[in-house]
């Protein structure tokens, strides 16, 4: 029984992976019913010039609401874990099935001790070597947004 459960867990190394392409591959695995663990989530990259990428993320922080922002403001992701998870969430179905699939995703900053020495997967179609232009890591974006990690 435990060997069958172990086969359903996929561990992905996000270091040097393009965030959007990696997220679409993760969604494909989730639709197959697998549990996905992502390590080095802060080392995933977002394509584009650094200033443009950061400004586009900061633009989301300036959105105002007519409601009391202290009671129910618009929550925006700032930590690398939440940025990656939000990207994956945007690609999942907007239904109860999508919410169940999102619970099968775990994202870690760095590599936890329990996963050291394990085999990681990297998607060849989402490797950073595909990019000809500039890119920025998720860690840099989240530190610019105010993440204190």
Swiss-Prot record:
CDD domains: Ribosomal_L13. GO terms for molecular function: mRNA binding; structural constituent of ribosome. One of its GO terms (cellular component) is ribosome. The keyword Protease does not apply. Coiled coil: none annotated. Pfam families: Ribosomal_L13. InterPro entries: Ribosomal_uL13 (IPR005822), Ribosomal_uL13_bac-type (IPR005823), Ribosomal_uL13_CS (IPR023563), Ribosomal_uL13_euk/arc (IPR005755), Ribosomal_uL13_sf (IPR036899). Part of the 50S ribosomal subunit. This protein is one of the early assembly proteins of the 50S ribosomal subunit, although it is not seen to bind rRNA by itself. It is important during the early stages of 50S assembly. This is Large ribosomal subunit protein uL13. It comes from Saccharolobus solfataricus (strain ATCC 35092 / DSM 1617 / JCM 11322 / P2) (Sulfolobus solfataricus).
């Amino acid at each position: 029984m435990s060997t069958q459960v172990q086969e359903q867990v996929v561990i992905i190394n996000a270091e040097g992976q393009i965030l959007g392409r990696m997220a679409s591959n993760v969604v494909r695995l989730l639709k197959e019913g697998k549990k996905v663990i992502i390590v080095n989530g802060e080392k995933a990259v977002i394509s584009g010039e650094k200033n443009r990428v950061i400004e586009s993320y900061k633009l989301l922080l300036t959105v105002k609401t007519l409601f009391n922002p202290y009671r129910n403001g618009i929550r925006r992701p700032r930590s690398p874990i939440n940025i990656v998870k939000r990207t994956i969430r945007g690609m999942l179905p907007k239904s109860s099935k999508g919410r169940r699939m999102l619970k099968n995703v775990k994202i870690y900053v760095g590599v936890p001790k329990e996963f050291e020495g394990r085999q990681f997967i990297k998607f060849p179609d989402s490797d950073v070597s595909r990019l000809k232009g500039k890119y920025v890591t998720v860690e840099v974006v989240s530190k610019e947004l105010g993440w204190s990690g």
